[in-house]
């Protein structure tokens, strides 16, 4: 009987990873075809342990040639192309089989979950055309990152398969071992000479440049790919626009970014990443109402059949997380908790969401109640998760909650347990005593940082901290703070000071503040911001008062406005908001404050804001409301 699906794989010198891949799907697949392109290690021997269908192919420098050769030996009704550095998930594969038994598109996009970086700690999700009908009408094209097309080079109708493929080939150690990027670039440079106008080739070069960290060249190549696309349905065309946006975001070129996003939204209205990216930019620029509108539209949509291309959480987890963040900023704690809870339900491994929920609960509940909530919702699913949460709770000074978390962990390495105990004791103002091994393991587990070490050394100079710090990349911090060494960066100085303020270490904070004189006077504004952040408003005001008005930070102006509004000193709050507009004309928040405070001139204030932000939907609504009110008032006279 003809198999439903043939697994096709091309290999060369993959002995170090091939067995793991084949073992992941041998038991539940019907036919495995392996094509070897010239291995000199044990690749073929390992392949023959799993299948009888192992074939040799003389390498032509073109991956598509090898994939198409493999397809000729496949007898299945459908082909699923897999690489040696990938594994299959059984449950989703069975869902794929069910889908393929019914009428469906000839090409199917698979979900590729890639583990990248050191030890695969970072994951990215992408879609690639990997499943296709084995009827001779479809083939691969392209020397690398092959693309499925009709045999006569026409685009073929494409659907979305439920299958998940886990890709390990871009973990740092595997990339280094295989030299993938260098190999790929050599092949692509050869192909681009023969086909300069191929958008797909430029897209692949962009991918390799991006992976190598050459962001400037990557942006050029993705831009070429986007311009040269000849069919908007190609996944690489959509991904080109996505990567252009990503790279422009990294360079903070927001206007250009919004332009490409708007263009992409028109071309691909069913790709949710583009409105999500627009909302994220609006959030960064404090246009919260417009951002909220987009996030809610992604969640509430019942019209558009969204098809994510990279971020599978673009229509659920991410909008919920961002709405939680915005409502928290607006002090709408009920809505914030609602959205963080929904975000956690979508992705229970996001530490940021968990900690935001913990911080929210700490405003209204006792530590035991918070910990009971954490237990009910399985926050501490592993020792690693518990330690990550501990790192956050101890930095924020939550001593009792941190103790409850420690008590729930049963398999913590003793030096790490010692480090956590000292962190908690520090919050309780207990004299710090810690071994060097506990310091080392605490740093390794990211429980201890330079700010902790400096604080402990200040409180107990007999600890082995000098040696640890001087033999690390934070030796300059120790030298500056304790040995009158060269000035460290402002960022590092404020990082150490913030910990002292967060933990209420007044005497130590005073010691650090005495060192600020080596910096420009504007440092006082940043120090004021820190005191304000941790609710030491009176101390913050003292620092703001010794800073020139032009040196107050944007956050400083916002802090002062909030303080004055809470104190009902509206005239002065309005004056500072106007000064904020003069100094930071592109910051939406200052315009919004003038609209809220200056009710007598509201229409004029809205018009001034719209001159700077002509596309802001919230301002347009406000102006309409004011116009309706004025028309009604005129008619009633």
Where is each model-derived feature located?
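Short, well-formed alpha-helical segments that are part of the catalytic scaffolds
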Residues: 6-28
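Acidic helix N-cap motif at the loop->helix transition within catalytic regions
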Residues: 16-19, 41-50, 91
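Short beta-strand/loop segment that forms part of the nucleotide-sugar
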Residues: 30-38, 55, 84
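A conserved acidic beta->alpha catalytic loop
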Residues: 36-45, 59
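Catalytic-site signature of metal-activated, phosphate-bearing donor transferases
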Residues: 65-71, 82, 89-213, 217
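Short aromatic/hydrophobic "clamp" motif used to bind/position activated sugar donors
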Residues: 79
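Alpha-helical repeat scaffolds
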Residues: 219-224, 254-265, 290-297, 333-342, ...
């Amino acid at each position: 009987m003809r198999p439903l699906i043939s697994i096709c794989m091309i290999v060369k010198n993959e002995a170090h990873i091939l067995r793991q891949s084949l073992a992941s799907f041998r038991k539940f697949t019907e036919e495995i075809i392996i094509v070897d392109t010239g291995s000199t290690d044990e690749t073929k021997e390992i392949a023959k342990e799993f299948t009888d269908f192992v074939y040799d192919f003389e390498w032509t420098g073109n991956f598509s040639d090898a994939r198409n050769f493999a397809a000729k030996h496949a007898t299945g009704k459908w082909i699923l192309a897999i690489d040696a550095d990938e594994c299959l998930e059984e449950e989703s594969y069975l869902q794929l089989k069910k889908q393929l038994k019914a009428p469906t598109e000839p090409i199917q996009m698979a979900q590729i979950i890639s583990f990248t970086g050191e030890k695969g700690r970072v994951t990215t999700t992408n879609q690639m055309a990997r499943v296709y009908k084995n009827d001779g009408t479809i083939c691969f094209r392209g020397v690398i990152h092959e693309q499925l097309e009709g045999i006569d080079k026409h685009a073929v109708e494409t659907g979305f398969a439920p299958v998940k493929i886990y890709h390990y080939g871009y973990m740092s150690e595997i990339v280094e071992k295989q030299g993938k990027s260098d190999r790929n670039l050599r092949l692509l440079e050869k192909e681009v000479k023969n086909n300069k106008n191929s958008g797909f080739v430029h897209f692949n070069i962009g991918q390799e440049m991006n992976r190598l960290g050459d962001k400037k060249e990557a942006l050029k190549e993705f831009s070429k790919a986007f311009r040269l696309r000849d069919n908007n349905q190609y996944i690489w065309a959509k991904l080109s626009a996505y990567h252009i946006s990503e790279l422009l975001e990294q360079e903070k070129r927001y206007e250009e970014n919004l332009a490409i996003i708007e263009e992409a939204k028109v071309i691909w209205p069913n790709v949710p990443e583009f409105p999500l990216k627009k909302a994220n930019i609006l959030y960064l620029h404090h246009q919260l109402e417009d951002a909220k509108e987009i996030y809610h539209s992604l969640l509430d949509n019942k019209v558009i059949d969204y098809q994510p291309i990279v971020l599978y959480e673009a229509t659920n987890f991410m909008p919920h997380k961002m709405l939680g963040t915005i409502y928290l900023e607006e002090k709408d704690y009920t809505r914030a908790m609602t959205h963080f809870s929904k975000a956690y339900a979508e992705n229970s491994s996001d530490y940021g969401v968990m900690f935001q929920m913990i911080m929210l609960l700490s405003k209204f509940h006792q530590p035991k109640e918070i910990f009971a909530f954490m237990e009910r919702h399985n926050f501490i699913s592993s020792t690693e998760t518990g330690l990550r949460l501990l790192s956050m709770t101890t930095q924020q000074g939550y001593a009792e909650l941190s103790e409850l978390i420690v008590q729930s962990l049963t398999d913590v390495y003793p030096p790490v347990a010692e480090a956590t105990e000292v962190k908690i004791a520090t919050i309780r103002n207990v004299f710090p005593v810690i071994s060097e091994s506990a310091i080392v393991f605490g740093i390794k587990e990211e429980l201890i940082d330079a700010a902790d070490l400096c604080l402990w050394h200040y409180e107990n100079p007999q600890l082995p901290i000098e040696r640890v710090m001087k033999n690390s990349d934070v030796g300059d911090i120790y030298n500056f703070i304790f040995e009158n060494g060269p000035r460290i960066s402002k960022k590092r100085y404020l990082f150490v000071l913030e910990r002292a303020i967060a933990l209420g270490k007044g005497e130590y904070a005073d010691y650090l503040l005495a060192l600020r004189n080596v910096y420009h006077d504007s440092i006082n504004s940043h120090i004021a911001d820190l005191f304000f952040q941790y609710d030491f408003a009176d101390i913050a005001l003292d620092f703001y008062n010794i800073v020139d008005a032009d040196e107050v930070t944007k956050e400083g102006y916002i802090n002062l406005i909030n303080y004055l509004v809470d104190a009902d000193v509206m005239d002065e709050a309005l004056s500072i908001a106007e000064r904020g507009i003069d100094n930071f004309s592109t910051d939406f928040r200052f315009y919004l404050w003038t609209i809220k405070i200056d009710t007598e001139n509201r229409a004029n204030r809205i018009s001034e804001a719209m001159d700077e932000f002509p596309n802001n939907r919230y301002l347009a609504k406000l102006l309409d409301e004011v116009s309706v009110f004025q028309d009604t008032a005129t008619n009633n006279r």
